[in-house]
From Swiss-Prot:
<dbReference type="GO" id="GO:0006952">
    <property type="term" value="P:defense response"/>
</dbReference>
<keyword id="KW-0968">Cytoplasmic vesicle</keyword>
<dbReference type="InterPro" id="IPR052006">
    <property type="entry name" value="MLP-like"/>
</dbReference>
<comment type="function">
    <text>Not known; MLPs constitute up to 50% of the soluble latex protein.</text>
</comment>
<dbReference type="Pfam" id="PF00407">
    <property type="entry name" value="Bet_v_1"/>
</dbReference>
<comment type="similarity">
    <text>Belongs to the MLP family.</text>
</comment>
<dbReference type="InterPro" id="IPR023393">
    <property type="entry name" value="START-like_dom_sf"/>
</dbReference>
<dbReference type="InterPro" id="IPR000916">
    <property type="entry name" value="Bet_v_I/MLP"/>
</dbReference>
<dbReference type="GO" id="GO:0031410">
    <property type="term" value="C:cytoplasmic vesicle"/>
</dbReference>
<keyword id="KW-0926">Vacuole</keyword>
<protein>
    <recommendedName>
        <fullName>Major latex protein 22</fullName>
    </recommendedName>
</protein>
<dbReference type="GO" id="GO:0005773">
    <property type="term" value="C:vacuole"/>
</dbReference>
Length: 158
C-alpha cells in the first residue's frame, strides 16, 4: 500500500510516497541505477531514456527521459547521482518542461535494503515553484505506480 506525505511552505514543497515491495531489493536499485531497462519494464510510463553527458556508470551523468504523466508525453534532462552505500539515487532536473513551473525539481529514490526479498521503496520529490501560480506537482505522486509495476515486472523474472 502506498503512503503519501505532502508539505508545502510558500513556494517550496516536498512530496513523498512509500511502498512495500516483495521482490528482490537489489533488483529495484539496479534497474533505476542502470536505467536502460525501464522502458522495457514499464513502457506505459517510460518511453525512452539515454545518457547524454557522461557515462551511466559514473555518478553525476546527465540523462534524457521520455515519459508520460497524466497521458501527456514529456521530456526532461536530469543529472543523476547515486550513493551505493545508502542505496539512494538522486535526479536533479536540468532541462525540460518541468523548469517552466519550477526553479528546482528533484526526485530521490531510496531503497535501503541491500538484498533479499521485501523492502520499502521511497520516492521523494522536492521542488521550488517559480511563483504562486505554479501548480503543486501532485501528478508526480503517481510514481507509486512505477514502484507497483516494477514489483510485478521484477517478481515475474525472479
Amino acid at each position: 500500500m502506498a503512503e503519501h506525505h505532502h508539505t508545502i511552505s510558500g513556494l517550496v514543497g516536498k512530496l513523498v510516497t512509500e511502498l512495500e515491495v516483495n521482490c528482490n531489493a537489489d533488483e529495484y536499485y539496479k534497474i533505476f541505477k542502470h536505467h536502460e531497462d525501464l522502458p522495457n519494464a514499464i513502457p506505459h510510463i517510460y518511453r525512452g531514456v539515454k545518457a547524454v553527458e557522461g557515462d551511466r556508470i559514473t555518478s553525476g551523468f546527465i540523462k534524457e527521459w521520455h515519459y508520460i504523466i497524466e497521458g501527456k508525453p514529456l521530456t526532461c534532462k536530469e543529472r543523476t547521482t547515486y550513493e551505493d552505500e545508502a542505496r539512494t539515487i538522486h535526479h536533479s532536473t536540468v532541462e525540460g518542461v518541468l523548469l517552466d513551473d519550477y526553479k528546482k525539481f528533484d526526485a530521490t529514490l531510496v531503497n535501503p535494503k541491500a538484498d533479499g526479498h521485501g523492502s520499502i521503496v521511497t520516492w521523494i520529490v522536492e521542488y521550488e515553484k517559480i511563483n504562486e501560480d505554479s501548480p503543486v506537482p501532485i501528478s508526480y505522486l503517481t510514481f507509486h505506480k512505477i514502484i507497483e509495476d516494477l514489483n510485478t515486472y521484477l517478481c515475474a523474472s525472479d
